[in-house]
């Protein structure tokens, strides 16, 4: 599913191509591009869920904390998000790319991927997609885009 999401993001969203394509035509295009039908459906559902996070009712249920609060992960989240990825999320909060609200959106979207092994690169793409979809996060999106395309980003302790 991650391949489909990255393809859609790079082809339509990131390249400023207008995405006024009917879902059926988009599905056909993705299938012709060689993606599996199940991955296509899951990716489109994932994008719909991401778009729903912009709704005020959905925002209300996302917990926000103060700048000194610490995120405690559930066991399911620990199982789905490895230590390196959790550390990267903390790093993004510390450098103000993510807020507690956008962090929660990222975690929710990562868990919706239903993947056994989330790579750091996949996490970076999810963060980028979330930030792209949240109004007022243009600066954070730009910073994340730089982090995504810079391979020598390291966490220093």
Curated annotation (Swiss-Prot):
It holds the Pfam family DUF494. InterPro entries: Smg. Belongs to the Smg family. PANTHER family: PROTEIN SMG. This is Protein Smg homolog. The gene is smg.
């Amino acid at each position: 599913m991650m391949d489909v999401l990255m393809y859609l993001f790079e082809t339509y969203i990131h390249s400023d191509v207008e995405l006024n394509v009917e879902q059926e035509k988009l599905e056909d295009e993705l299938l012709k591009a060689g993606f599996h039908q199940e991955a296509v459906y899951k990716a489109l559902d994932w994008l719909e869920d991401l778009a729903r996070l912009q709704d005020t009712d959905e925002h209300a249920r996302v917990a926000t904390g103060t700048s000194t609060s610490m995120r405690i992960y559930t066991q399911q989240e620990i199982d789905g998000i490895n230590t390196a990825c959790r550390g990267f999320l903390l790093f993004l909060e510390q450098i103000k790319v993510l807020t507690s609200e956008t962090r929660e959106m990222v975690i929710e979207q990562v868990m919706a991927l239903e993947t056994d092994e989330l790579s750091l690169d996949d996490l970076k793409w999810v963060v980028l997609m979330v930030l792209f979809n949240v109004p007022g996060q243009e600066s954070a999106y730009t910073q994340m885009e730089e982090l995504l395309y810079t391979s020598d980003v390291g966490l220093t302790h």
